[in-house]
A protein has these predicted regions:
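N-terminal signal peptide c-region/cleavage motif recognized by signal peptidases
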Residues: 17-19
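Short hydrophobic alpha-helices and adjacent helix-cap/hinge residues
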Residues: 2-3, 24, 28, 52-56, ...
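An extracytoplasmic/periplasmic, membrane-proximal ligand-sensing/linker region
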Residues: 27-29, 213, 260-320
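Anionic-ligand binding region
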Residues: 188-245
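Bacterial N-terminal signal peptides that target proteins for export
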Residues: 1-9, 15
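N-terminal (or domain-start) structured segment
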Residues: 22-112, 150-153, 159, 175-200, ...
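Hinge/capping helix and adjacent helix->loop/strand transition within the periplasmic-binding protein
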Residues: 80-86, 93, 101-188, 237, ...
Length: 320
């Protein structure tokens, strides 16, 4: 009897300790690591939700930029962090689904070394064209590209990035062959588009919209499944090419083996942050839609997107 009583007490204390540990999270600041420098859409979104998460969790939530190698450095640092819920990674679709296909020598495995938390938000791209290009819509663009195969060049912010992938998917879907001209970043890519050195590019809303508003570029179409609120009169590519859809998305993940209850607590904090009116307004200005799906849904989505882009990369014979 004494042995059973002692066993009961030990078991009860263990359960209580586990309960207290779960209830005490978080007990110190949480760091959201980004693989890119400040100023981009990813950084803006992270800094919008961080203070809201802090209020919800009762601890500071700090955004830390660790740029380099297209996000690999930041992602690697989180893969090696303690799986305790205090260090998480927030990155782009490229980090989770394109880079792993293009680079087989990554110092981590997205599927094995990370625990998905949530897809934070998503955004369609915009097909921007030079003002001198004699086309008014996607159908005319395709016809012009077929009639002038040697005159059609598209720019991108770099080889293997989403703007490059979007244009290659457009090439394939439209049955055309435009030439890729990669740049070191979005700014020089767009500047040469304005100057007429290239004919078109696929880019984020925030990158090209000011130039559309100033009359330097034209927004021919957007790449999501529905029209953007900031460009309501601009059609989607899918109105001409059925099924065409390219969205950039932003997701959050923790090191593998992070306790499930902490993953779920972080997901809830992100979801609640995205419901705040000021956050929704700021995201809308960027042409970004909040998502906040479950960890399981996000994990499945990463795999689906990886498979999808692997086919695009294979069909276009894209190499790093």
């Amino acid at each position: 009897m004494k042995h059973l009583a002692k066993l009961f007490v030990v078991t009860a204390l263990s359960l209580q300790a586990g309960f207290v540990m779960a209830q005490s999270y978080p007990s110190k600041p949480i760091t959201i690591v980004l693989g890119f420098p400040p100023g981009g859409a990813l950084d803006i979104i992270a800094r919008q939700i961080a203070p809201k998460m802090s209020s919800d969790l009762g601890q500071p939530v700090v955004v830390e930029n660790k740029p380099g190698a297209g996000g690999v450095i930041g992602m690697q640092s989180v893969a090696r962090a303690e799986p305790d819920g205090y260090t998480v990674f927030m990155g782009t679709m490229g980090n989770f689904s394109i880079t792993p296909v293009l680079n087989k020598d990554l110092p981590y495995n997205v599927q094995k070394d990370f625990a998905p938390i949530t897809q934070v938000a998503s955004s369609g791209f915009v097909l921007y064209v030079n003002n001198q290009l004699p086309v008014k819509n996607v159908a005319e663009l395709i016809a012009y590209a077929k009639a002038n195969p040697d005159k059609m060049n598209f720019s991108s912010s770099g080889n293997g990035g989403l703007p490059h992938m979007a244009a290659e998917m457009f090439n394939s879907a439209a049955g055309i062959k435009m030439t890729h001209v990669p740049y070191k970043g979005s700014a020089p890519s767009v500047q040469d588009l304005i100057a007429g050195q290239v004919q078109l590019t696929f880019e984020a809303v925030a990158i090209g919209l000011p130039h559309v508003q100033s009359g330097k570029l034209r927004a021919l179409a957007t790449t999501g499944s529905q029209r953007l609120g900031v460009l309501p009169d601009v059609p989607i590519v899918a109105e001409t090419i059925q099924g065409f859809s390219v969205t950039n998305w932003f997701g959050m993940a923790a090191p593998a083996k992070t306790p499930a209850e902490r993953i779920n607590r972080l997901q809830k904090a992100v979801a609640d942050a995205l419901k705040q009116p000021d956050v929704k307004q700021k995201l809308a200005q960027l042409g970004v839609e909040p998502v906040a799906d479950s960890p399981a849904q996000f994990g499945a989505f990463i795999q689906t997107e990886t498979n999808r882009w692997a086919k695009v990369i294979r069909d276009a014979n894209i190499k790093m």
